[in-house]
Design a protein with these regions (language model features):
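His/Glu-based metal-binding/catalytic segments typifying zinc-dependent metallopeptidases
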Residues: 1-32
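PPIase-associated folding chaperone regions across multiple families
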Residues: 14-22, 144, 148-151, 156, ...
Length: 198
């Protein structure tokens, strides 16, 4: 399962810090994220599920996406759960508690990553290419630290448009149907009516 949404923004866009932290809460934080809690822990539909956000440094090219590993017979249930969590985020937003916990996790992960020589070398190369220094990284972190739930919710509603998300599902669906027929179990329920077809 792979979902992708292209966004016209760079990593210097004013909305980018909020998009990054909003994604951390939705699916970037792995086990503590909303997608992992719902799809992996609650419903047991995927062992590996998450989301990501990115923005290029040179151009207004960015995006948001999500992924999940699943058994073919669970495809429709997984997509339905994914769409429900997306709708819940857009309608209800994130809480202050979720935002503060996401900040701590995101900053801690950054500290761990910066202890790796390969990461530092890559960043130095990027900074030379885009005429930046580590002061840029510090400023970005400070922007993330200053974010409120209201700011993040506004940015997520602005950029994450369900109808514009492309979804790709791959798997042995015919094999799953034959297996279900042989066992006498009904096929997986289809996605909820009214959801966009991809």
């Amino acid at each position: 399962f792979f979902a992708q949404l292209k966004l016209p923004l760079s990593d210097a866009d004013p909305d980018y810090p909020a998009l990054v932290l909003g994604n951390e809460i939705l699916g970037g934080g792995f086990l503590n994220s909303r997608l992992a809690t719902r799809i992996r822990q609650k419903e047991g539909l995927s062992y590996g599920v998450g989301s990501f956000a990115y923005g290029q440094s040179a151009d207004q090219i960015g995006g948001w996406g999500a992924y999940a590993i699943y058994a073919p017979e669970n495809a429709a249930r997984l997509e339905a759960a994914f769409r429900e969590e997306l709708d819940k985020m857009l309608k209800e937003g994130f809480t202050d508690k979720e935002v503060e916990e996401a900040k701590k996790g995101w900053l801690q992960n950054n500290n761990v990553t910066r202890a790796q020589d390969g990461f530092i070398a890559g960043k130095l190369e990027d900074h030379l290419t885009y005429n930046r220094t580590f002061k840029w990284e510090e400023d970005f972190e400070n922007k993330v630290k200053a974010l409120t739930a209201a700011q993040i919710n506004a940015v997520m509603k602005k950029h994450i448009v369900p109808g514009k998300i492309s979804i790709v599902k791959a798997g042995d669906f015919e094999g799953a149907k034959k297996k279900a027929a042989a066992s006498g179990k009904p096929d997986d329920k289809p996605a909820a009516a009214g959801t966009p077809k991809n």
